[in-house]
């Protein structure tokens, strides 16, 4: 008897990566996305060797090389005076040590690469404007109902629907969101609008007082992507993501150096996110339902591992499904397999944010001095991330 398709909720990075991996192995899938079209947000993402290896193994090497940037170096600098605290060769080191390069790209470019590859295999399996309403687990299948009251049956339902996951809400009805007192500003600037000192600068992390700012080129160097995080006491809006006010952005980073000021001055429409912690995500899985990516384990953007972790989830889950003909019974194994690494990534990301945001002058001096001295002796940035980058899903 032919198996019912696996139902994937969400056409983001985790959902599309999972779908592509399964389709390449002749597993039927259906993808349902609540938005009316494929995501077109211009936010930048890091694709470190642990993510690059996945894309290459999916046959996407040429495509990602044609759209993304390979940074030569990365720098850590003081937010106020621009003093260079640490500098690390990135791509030669990554390719020599981990066999795969480090990319920086626009999120929508990666989404479109995955989307186009899926459409080559089957252009009739992605449905837009379908928001999950509920699902019911039956003996041999799962019945899924959408907000348009259409119903679909599948063998499994996989929630790849991000931080506001509807699948997670059903699996974990007691889970609640809590504002982390951090907001993130994002934007892109045309490289032609910026002065030479900025266009020639390596990807840089600027470490300030209860704030930090990161920028790097994307889209083969035609655009500069930035993300800035700052501590806030409250987030009043119902939406976690919205267009931001440029004057508020200037106010949040008002005491910055001239480079950050110029980047902010040239951004057209900045976006801002309230960063929320999701409490009590106890269950990633039931017998026929599973959540992956941000739906299962949201993390702060301060380690640049959100997209990579989502791709890791997708590939590992695809292998579990492929190795078990009765895969409906093996979803619990996924959580057991992934939880340790994910928790370590979340803790490391939170730790990075604390280091980037240090306010105490004495502690800041000690840490900044330590970074400066250690960087002269050992590749401190790469050493800190080695356990992440060497992972091969």
Question: Where on the chain are the PLM-derived regions?
Answer:
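A short coil-to-beta-strand element that immediately follows conserved catalytic motifs
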Residues: 178-182, 198-202, 258-274
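C-terminal auxiliary extensions adjacent to catalytic cores
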Residues: 371-393
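Conserved mid-domain beta->alpha element of the FAD-binding
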Residues: 11-32, 158-159, 185, 215, ...
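Flavin-binding catalytic cores
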Residues: 239-271, 327
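Residues at the starts of beta-strands that form the adenosine-phosphate
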Residues: 5, 28, 223-226
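Active-site substrate-recognition segment that forms the wall
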Residues: 201-236, 253, 275
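Conserved Rossmann-like nucleotide-cofactor binding loop
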Residues: 14, 37, 164
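Conserved N-terminal helical subregion
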Residues: 2-6, 48-190, 233-250, 393
């Amino acid at each position: 008897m032919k198996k019912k398709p696996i139902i994937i909720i969400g056409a983001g990075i985790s959902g599309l990566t999972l779908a592509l991996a399964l389709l390449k192995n002749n597993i039927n899938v259906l993808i349902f996305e609540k938005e009316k079209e494929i995501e077109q947000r211009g936010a930048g993402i890091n694709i470190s060797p642990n993510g690059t290896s996945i894309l290459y193994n999916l046959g996407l090497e040429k495509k990602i090389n044609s759209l993304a940037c390979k940074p030569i170096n990365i720098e850590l600098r003081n937010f106020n005076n621009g003093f260079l605290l640490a500098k690390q060769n990135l791509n030669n080191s990554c390719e020599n040590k981990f066999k795969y390069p480090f990319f920086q790209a626009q999120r929508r470019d990666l989404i479109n690469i995955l989307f186009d590859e899926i459409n080559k295999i089957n252009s009739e399996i992605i449905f837009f404007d379908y928001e999950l309403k509920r699902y019911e687990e039956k003996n041999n299948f799962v019945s899924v109902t959408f907000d348009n009251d259409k119903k679909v049956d599948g063998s499994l339902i996989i929630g790849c629907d991000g931080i506001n996951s509807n699948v997670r809400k059903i699996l974990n009805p007691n889970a609640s969101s809590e504002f982390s007192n951090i907001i993130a500003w994002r934007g892109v600037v045309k490289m032609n609008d910026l002065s030479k000192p900025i266009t020639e600068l390596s990807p840089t992390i600027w470490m300030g007082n209860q704030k930090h700012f990161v920028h790097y080129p994307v889209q083969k160097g035609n655009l500069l992507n930035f993300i800035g995080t700052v501590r806030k006491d409250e987030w009043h809006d119902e939406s976690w993501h919205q267009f931001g006010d440029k004057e508020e952005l200037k106010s949040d980073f008002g005491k910055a150096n001239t480079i950050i000021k110029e980047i902010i001055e040239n951004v057209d429409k900045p976006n801002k996110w309230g960063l929320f912690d999701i409490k009590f995500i106890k269950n990633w899985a039931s017998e026929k339902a599973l959540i992956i990516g941000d739906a299962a384990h949201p993390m702060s953007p301060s380690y640049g591992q959100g997209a990579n972790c989502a791709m890791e989830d997708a590939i590992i889950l695809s292998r579990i499904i492929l190795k078990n003909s009765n895969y409906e019974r093996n979803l619990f194994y996924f959580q057991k397999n992934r939880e340790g690494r994910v928790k370590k990534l979340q803790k490391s990301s939170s730790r990075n944010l604390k280091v980037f945001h240090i306010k105490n002058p004495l502690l800041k001096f000690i840490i900044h001095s330590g970074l400066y001295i250690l960087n002269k002796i050992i590749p401190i940035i790469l050493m800190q991330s080695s356990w992440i980058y060497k992972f091969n899903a």
